[in-house]
Structure formats: C-alpha cells, structure tokens
A protein has these predicted regions:
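C-terminal helical cap(s) of enzyme catalytic domains, especially alpha/beta-barrels
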Residues: 53, 57, 95-111, 244-260
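Alpha-helix-loop-beta-strand connector modules within alpha/beta enzyme cores
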Residues: 47-81, 104-111, 145-147, 195-218
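N-terminal amphipathic alpha-helix/helix-capping segment at the start of soluble metabolic enzymes
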Residues: 1-18, 132-148, 204-206, 211-212
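Conserved anion-binding
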Residues: 74, 86-172
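Conserved N-terminal beta1-alpha1 strand-loop-helix module at the mouth
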Residues: 1-64, 70-71, 103, 152, ...
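Hydrophobic faces of well-ordered beta-strands that scaffold small-molecule active sites
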Residues: 14-19, 36-38, 64-68, 87-89, ...
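Histidine/lysine/aspartate-rich catalytic loop segments that bind and position anionic ligands
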Residues: 172-192
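Catalytic cores of alpha/beta
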Residues: 26-30, 66, 71-85, 89, ...
C-alpha cells in the first residue's frame, strides 16, 4: 500500500524529489522517484494549496510526503486528510515532542488523530458508508491499515536532538530520522561545512543510533558537491535529489539526436 515503507523494510535506498503545489504532479510521480516531498515550512504555500497536486498523484508510483511547518496536531491532521502518505515534522528535539508527533499521526488506540472518513489512496470518502453496509469491524480494519502504512519522519536538526537521540528513537512508530543538513551544521558550529570532521561525526552518531533502534536515517537533501553514495555507505537510505537538471539533460540529449 505504501511503497516507501515496503522499500525501507527491505533495506533499499529510497529516493525522492521536491514536488510543487502549483501543477499536476502525475507525470513526475511516475518517473521513478519513490516519493515526492511537499514543503510547507520554508516554501510559501499552505497545506490546502497542496490538495490538487496530492490528488493528481492518486494511483501513481511515488508516495506524497508533506513537511508541515511545526509539530502541531491540526497541521498534521489536515496534511493527512489532504492525501499525504508520509509526514515530516521539523525540529523534533525531545522524546516528548516525538511522542506528540506520532500520536498526531495515528488513530486511536495508537494516537489521537481525528477521523474524517476514508481518505486518500486508502479509499474514497463516503459519509454514507456505515449506513450502506460497511461494518464497524471493517472500519476498524481501515484505521489499523492507515496506522500501519503511514510514514512518520521526525527531523533531527540540533545538538539537543543529538543529545536526546536514544530517547527520541525509543518512541514506537518512527520510520525515518531525517537530518536537516544546513540547520544541523549551524548547530554544530560548522555552518554548511558538510565535509568537516565535526559534521561527519554528528552524522555517524545519528547513523549508529538509528541502527541500534531499527530506524532508517535519512538526509533532507544531499549537500551540493557531495556524492549521494557517500551517504548511502554511511547508512543513510532516505533522501531527496533535484530533478530539474536531469530533466534538462534528457531534453538536451533528445534534441541533440535530431537533425535540425
């Protein structure tokens, strides 16, 4: 149901790219990426603006993943209702914040997410479903499936989070611990100096803790000039890469082969 979770469970590297709120994402969602990431923290968009893009991805290969702007239950709930199959929350620094995130993502009894009917790729919303014969047991089965399939991704971006990493990773339900590369480098006193020993030691600490807890470490993006395989070799199996340059190269190669 959620291809990203299946890939992570099998130990594969999961690669995504940035999605846009202002366009039909159907084509990009079927190019081979495992997920499209929609940002509402730094991008000038609100979750409600993502609805057409998320709906255009229905039935496509890539899973829609949304980064909300903060660790608020209402923002998380609305992003999920809009069709997200994964949630990223920035600046998760403590176990308590991780617990709050997970509970906002999951339905009772694993969480506190409010229910508004069958949503997204898990089914069509139909307010008459109970009257028309959907049993209570079947509805419970749907809720349990969503709880199981949803991708939950807190971000680690501060020294405080590194200090609390074992407590954070002890929270059940976390699938990926996602490094915010630039913010973490600033916190470690080496702003955007990604090759520095200090920064790399921080990444090694994160990767080791994730291994110990059975959680996949990821990078929000691969820093400019760095080889993605460098991070894969460290154990980071979830990240985004830019697609525009690859698309431009493909167009250029295609045009170059035509007599003009």
């Amino acid at each position: 149901m959620n291809v990203v979770k299946d890939l992570l469970k099998s130990g594969k590297t999961v690669i995504g790219t940035a999605g846009s709120a202002f366009g039909d994402m159907a084509m990009l969602a079927d190019t081979g990426f495992d997920f499209l990431l929609f940002d509402t923290q730094h991008a000038p968009v609100e979750t409600k603006q993502l609805i057409p893009a998320l709906q255009s991805m229905r039935g496509k290969k890539a899973a829609p993943v949304v980064r909300v702007s903060s660790n608020r239950a209402d923002l998380i709930c609305f992003a999920l209702d809009a069709g997200a199959r994964g949630i990223i929350v920035p600046m998760v620094n403590t176990k308590e914040e991780a617990v709050a995130m997970v509970r906002a993502c999951k339905y009772f009894p694993l969480g506190d997410r409010s229910n508004s009917g069958v949503r997204g790729d898990w089914g069509e919303y139909n307010p008459d479903m109970m009257r028309d014969g959907m049993t209570s047991e079947a509805y419970r089965s749907y809720l349990d499936m969503v709880n199981e399939e949803l991708l939950i991704i807190p971000m680690i971006e501060t020294q405080q989070a590194i200090d609390n990493i074992d407590d954070i990773l002890s929270v059940p339900g976390i699938d990926v611990l996602l490094v915010g590369p630039s913010d973490l480098s600033i916190e470690l006193g080496v702003p955007v100096d990604y090759p520095s020993d200090t920064y790399q030691r921080g990444l090694d600490t994160i990767a080791a803790a994730c291994r110990n807890h059975g959680v996949v470490p990821g990078m929000y993006f691969i820093p400019p000039g760095m080889d993605p395989n460098f991070y894969v070799d460290k154990g980071f199996k979830f990240f985004t890469v830019p697609w525009a340059r690859w698309a431009a190269e493909g167009v250029q190669n295609g045009l170059a082969g035509i007599k003009r």
